[in-house]
Curated annotation (Swiss-Prot):
Pathway: Purine metabolism; IMP biosynthesis via de novo pathway; 5-amino-1-(5-phospho-D-ribosyl)imidazole from N(2)-formyl-N(1)-(5-phospho-D-ribosyl)glycinamide: step 2/2. One of its GO terms (cellular component) is cytosol. Its EC number is 6.3.3.1. One of its GO terms (molecular function) is phosphoribosylamine-glycine ligase activity. The keyword ATP-binding applies. It is an enzyme of class 6 (ligase). Keywords: ATP-binding, Cytoplasm, Ligase, Nucleotide-binding, Purine biosynthesis. It comes from Stenotrophomonas maltophilia (strain R551-3). It comes from the Bacteria. It catalyses: 2-formamido-N(1)-(5-O-phospho-beta-D-ribosyl)acetamidine + ATP = 5-amino-1-(5-phospho-beta-D-ribosyl)imidazole + ADP + phosphate + H(+). One of its GO terms (biological process) is 'de novo' IMP biosynthetic process. The keyword Metal-binding does not apply. This is Phosphoribosylformylglycinamidine cyclo-ligase. It holds the Pfam family AIRS.
Length: 352
């Protein structure tokens, strides 16, 4: 080896550039038990391969695969601000699997993407632990993921998340809203809070109010706990409902960005609209606080937040009592919130 001139630059390593491969390996070892806990019998192999394997051969006759991807929006900014990282992964899973559930599909497996400027192993492990917990609750295998350490891309201490899921449903049992008809009834199932939508407005209101971290809402729940409550996972109870009352359920909607105004109508055929009675349920305290502190108009609330309704079933009118009883048996708070009506033109949703 030739001698290095004294004027030559000192040798650099990847760690010098801001990427710590050893930290990434340590993270993988720490999360392995959590990830394996989420596995289903169909998972083939373990972690660390170039591709994750899943055997679909024995469960479905005519499977239709349903895929979904999502993030948690600027709820992440609030998580960073409050240093709460253990449940944001549940939000990530729920945002993805609740979406594919709308088609009647069972989530099979999930992959995550975690990106940060400098990897903090404790923070990343807390986040992935939440993802694994969410997958376990949804019956969905956390089959793989990517941890990207990218110096100079993110503010110190911050990270971004994305999730991806694949689900399956028998072709004959696919829910696409085609059977929705005038007279069908809307059953709204309770949310756990704002879930993961509207947080740019939430944070603006929270900041304008002086970030009242210790404020207690009606009922004794702290405001920050209500704002950070993880998105409710509807997978297991809804799949159970579909097995027992699938023919009675003509359509479903996950109430995400766009709120009640824009989500239910996505599964309603042209020529039909929605008449939603806002008085049929009580606006939860966290939404009451947001509306009052932000002086937010009713129409803006309906279009931004779920307002206490996280998932909606569109049900045949003669089956409402039976489906309501089945929802109750699943331990879910719910209300009859409106019906499908004939409607022409641009204004197809009425909330009053």
């Amino acid at each position: 080896m030739t001698n290095t001139p004294s004027s030559a630059p000192s040798p650099l390593t990847y760690r010098d550039a801001g990427v710590d491969i050893d930290a990434g390996n340590e993270l993988v070892e720490r999360i392995k038990p959590l990830v394996k806990r989420s596995f289903r019998p169909e998972v083939m192999g373990g972690l660390g391969g170039f591709g994750a394997l899943f055997d679909l051969s024995n469960k479905y006759r005519e499977p239709v695969l349903v895929s979904g991807t999502d993030g948690v929006g600027t709820k992440l900014k609030l998580a960073h601000q409050l240093n709460r990282h253990d449940t944001i992964g549940i939000d990530l899973v729920a945002m993805c699997v609740n979406d594919v559930l709308v088609q009647g599909a069972e989530p099979l497996f999930f992959l995550d993407y975690f990106a940060t400027g400098k990897l903090d192993i404790d923070t990343a492990a807390a986040v992935v632990g939440g993802i694994a917990n969410g997958c376990t609750e949804a019956g969905c295998a956390l089959i793989g993921g990517e941890t990207a350490e990218m110096p100079d891309m993110y503010a110190p201490g911050e990270y971004d998340l994305a999730g991806f899921t694949v689900a399956a449903v028998e072709k004959s049992e696919l829910k696409d809203g085609a059977s929705v008809a005038a007279g069908d009834v809307l059953i709204g199932i309770a949310s756990s809070g704002p879930h993961s939508n509207g947080y740019s407005l939430v944070r603006r209101i929270y900041d304008r109010a002086g970030r009242p971290a210790e404020l207690e809402l009606e009922g004794g729940v702290k405001l920050v706990d209500a704002l950070m409550a993880p998105t409710r996972l509807y997978v297991k109870p809804i799949l159970s409902l579909l097995k027992s009352h699938g023919a009675a359920i003509h359509g479903m909607a996950h109430i995400t960005g766009g709120g009640l105004t824009e989500n239910i109508i996505r599964v309603v055929p042209e020529g039909l609209g929605l008449d939603i009675q806002a008085s049929s349920w009580t606006l939860p305290p966290v939404f009451q606080w947001l509306q009052k502190e932000g002086a937010v108009a009713d129409s803006e609330m309906w279009r931004t937040f779920n307002c206490g309704i996280g998932f909606v079933l569109i049900v045949a009118p003669d089956q409402v009592a039976a489906v309501s009883e089945a929802v109750k048996a699943q331990g879910l708070d719910h209300w009859t919130i409106g019906q499908v009506v004939t409607a022409e033109g641009a204004e197809r949703v009425h909330i009053g």
